[in-house]
Amino acid sequence: MSIILKIKKTDDAKDLPLPAYMSEGAAGMDLYANVKEEVILQPGEIKLIPTGIQIELPPNFEAQIRPRSGLALNYGITLLNTPGTIDSDYRGEIKLIVINLGKEAVKIARGQRIAQMVINQIVRPTIVEAEILSETKRDEGGFGHTGI
């Protein structure tokens, strides 16, 4: 399935590349940091990092914003609300809530690949209140019910 994803760069991001897939089988396209100056993220610090893009998704689609595994593993940099959800009717700039969970300060430079965006189709079910739910073998077994 193929859809059209319209992407508009903000006025201060015209020099940055559009989001791009880095391999043939990549599920997510990389997003770039649209910072005017290098940002220093201290251990435990949270900052809002703009991407310089706005998107237009078709109805019944969403964009999930996810961390990049290399930044998480090597530097402890991740997104605080992951995955972040971009709804199809949102037209503002995509911004990232970035946190440094590492032990060292990390620099975020303009144009650095900072997160990835995955496009998903969504289903909006009809909600029906129920008094009884069907039983299953698992039933109400929750956290750790299959062992550790």
Curated annotation (Swiss-Prot):
Its cofactor is Mg(2+). Substrate binds at residues 68-70, 81, 85-87, 95. Its EC number is 3.6.1.23. Gene3D superfamilies: 2.70.40.10. CDD domains: trimeric_dUTPase. GO terms for biological process: dUMP biosynthetic process; dUTP catabolic process. Keywords: Hydrolase, Magnesium, Metal-binding, Nucleotide metabolism. GO terms for molecular function: dUTP diphosphatase activity; magnesium ion binding. Pfam families: dUTPase. It catalyses: dUTP + H2O = dUMP + diphosphate + H(+). It comes from the Bacteria. Belongs to the dUTPase family. HAMAP family: dUTPase_bact. This is Deoxyuridine 5'-triphosphate nucleotidohydrolase. The gene is dut.
